[in-house]
From Swiss-Prot:
It comes from Mus musculus. Cleavage relieves autoinhibition by releasing the N-terminal moiety (Gasdermin-A3, N-terminal) that initiates pyroptosis. In contrast to Gsdma, not cleaved by bacterial effector protein SpeB. The keyword Mitochondrion applies. This is Gasdermin-A3. GO terms for biological process: avascular cornea development in camera-type eye; extrinsic apoptotic signaling pathway; hair cycle; hair follicle development; hair follicle morphogenesis; mammary gland development; negative regulation of canonical Wnt signaling pathway; negative regulation of timing of anagen. Changing residue 270 to D: Spontaneous pyroptosis-inducing activity. A cardiolipin binds at residues 9-13. The chain crosses the membrane at residues 78-95, 99-120, 164-180, 184-198. Changing residue 14 to K: No spontaneous pyroptosis-inducing activity. Intramolecular interactions between N- and C-terminal domains are important for autoinhibition in the absence of activation signal. The intrinsic pyroptosis-inducing activity is carried by the N-terminal domain.
Length: 464
């Protein structure tokens, strides 16, 4: 995983481990996630591993009629982090407007990340709503309305106070040492020294709220939203004699891009959600599933390429274009539902580290995905609602079928998602802050297990 992404995710874990603060994934996009910036949510977002947003080139102020702008933003405080990528934290000392985190190893001792939070003051937002309406003929606004896209406004941003060079030395992701990985050809990818310079004012994390657009160019950014709310709600018919406000002349319908899993965040809901998406993938022809597995196998371990594929599918769906998978004897045309399902699983896979993606390739080759899936599923099923850390016994038969090499791969795969498996016992250490990581791993394993199982069956039939 890129150092910048390591930093932003670690920052969110420290500041807001179970809240709605979203880490920024791309350093190059930081200027487009400042307060008042407009962003779009990815098509297949889910609460189970967090919603993700993509930049636009506009701010809310760009869409409003000319007028005065808020003079400043509210500064919610300053925070200082030392050795932030360390896995184990020795102590946490709080003083007014300052938080210092001391760790054990990982970053160079000179690296201290100082951040501040900037947010839109409620009073400034209310004044803006009263004084400036939306510009009715703005091309971007009309384009989003035509495509029925939901727009979100960045309401709070965490930014770097000073330029800092963050150096990651050794393995800052794993929660235990894995010297045996060198024998598996993975040690180089896990222990590279990397560094990134974060400029002053760089946004590292942010919070968003939904923009609502009404008749007569009125707008709002409600504090509380539900999954049926849209930026451009449909207008309902009312009697001519009736007096009704612009905000009442709407008919809310569930949005197509709603946040999956928004109502009940438990393992049963996650499992049902994953099953719905795998059922759509199962509808592909045997050749289509085999082709999808081949394509993913080539991309696993190349996170940038996976993200590029995700953007390609998103763009095709937005433009109503058809997408095909390259396969023999002929290409396979993907339906809209199939593309939606593939986007869901791509979202899960891109949450994993590059190291995990490479381990998945090895696991595919060794045909141990069913064991790994069962391990993650069993752990989530037992602990999903567990809010306290703890060490719990592991069913001995879960890993009994694995040899030494397969066991090392499995320990590394789940360990990089924050689940520490201890052979003595056997037992595992549960940390509720890693739940989202394990949910993404569960979804990714579910897809690859389905595709490899179907592919093996196809191969067997062909040989029979």
């Amino acid at each position: 995983m890129p150092v910048f992404e390591d930093v932003t995710r670690a920052l969110v874990r420290e500041l807001n481990p179970r809240g709605d603060l979203t880490p920024l994934d791309s350093l190059i996009d930081f200027k487009h996630f400042r307060p008042f910036c407009l962003v779009l949510r990815k098509r297949k977002s889910t609460l189970f591993w967090g919603a993700r947003y993509v930049r636009t080139d506009y701010t809310l102020l760009d869409l409003l009629e000319p007028g005065s702008s808020p003079s400043d933003l509210t500064d919610s405080g300053n925070f200082s982090f030392k050795n932030m990528l360390d896995v184990q934290v020795q102590g946490l000392v709080e003083v007014p407007k300052t938080v210092k985190v001391k760790g054990t190893a990982g970053l160079s001792q000179s690296s201290t990340l100082e951040v501040q939070t900037l947010s839109v003051a409620p009073s400034a937002l209310e004044n803006l709503k009263k004084e400036r309406k939306l510009s009715a003929d703005h091309s971007f606004l009309n384009e989003m309305r035509y495509h029925e896209k939901n727009l979100y406004v960045v309401m709070e941003a965490v930014e770097a106070k000073q330029e800092v060079t963050v150096e990651q030395t050794g393995n800052a992701n794993a929660i235990f040492s894995l010297p045996s990985l060198a024998l598996l050809g993975l040690q180089g990818s896990l222990n590279n020294n990397k560094a990134v310079t974060i400029p002053k004012g760089c946004v590292l994390a942010y919070r968003v709220r939904l923009l609502r657009v009404f008749l007569f160019n009125l707008w709002d950014i409600p504090y509380i939203c539900n999954d049926s709310m849209q930026t451009f709600p449909k207008i309902r018919r009312v009697p001519c004699s009736a007096f009704i406000s612009p905000t009442q002349m709407i008919s809310e319908e569930p949005e197509e891009e709603k946040l999956i899993g928004e109502m009940h965040e438990d393992f049963k809901t996650l499992k049902e959600e994953v099953q719905r998406e795998t059922q759509e993938v199962e509808k592909l022809s045997p050749v289509g599933r085999s082709s999808l597995l081949t394509s993913l196998s080539h991309l696993l371990g190349k996170k940038k390429e996976l993200q590029d594929l995700e953007q390609k599918l998103e763009g095709a769906l937005d433009k109503g274009q058809k997408v095909t998978l390259e396969a023999l004897p002929k290409d396979v045309l993907l339906s809209k539902d199939a593309m939606d399902a593939i986007l869901y699983f791509l979202g899960a896979l891109t949450e994993l580290t590059e190291e995990q993606l490479k381990i998945l390739v090895k696991s595919l080759e060794k045909k141990i995905l069913p064991v790994q899936l069962k391990l993650v599923e069993s752990t989530l099923e037992q602990n999903f609602l567990q809010d306290k850390e703890g060490v719990f016994p592991l069913q001995p038969d879960l890993l009994s079928s694995l040899g030494e090499e397969e066991l090392t791969l499995t320990e590394a795969l789940v360990g990089l998602s924050g689940l520490e498996v201890q052979r003595s016992g056997p037992q595992y250490a549960w940390d509720p802050d890693t739940r989202h990581n394990l949910c993404a791993l569960y979804a990714g394993l579910s897809l690859l297990h389905l595709l490899s199982r179907k592919s093996n069956a196809l191969t067997y039939c062909a040989l029979s």
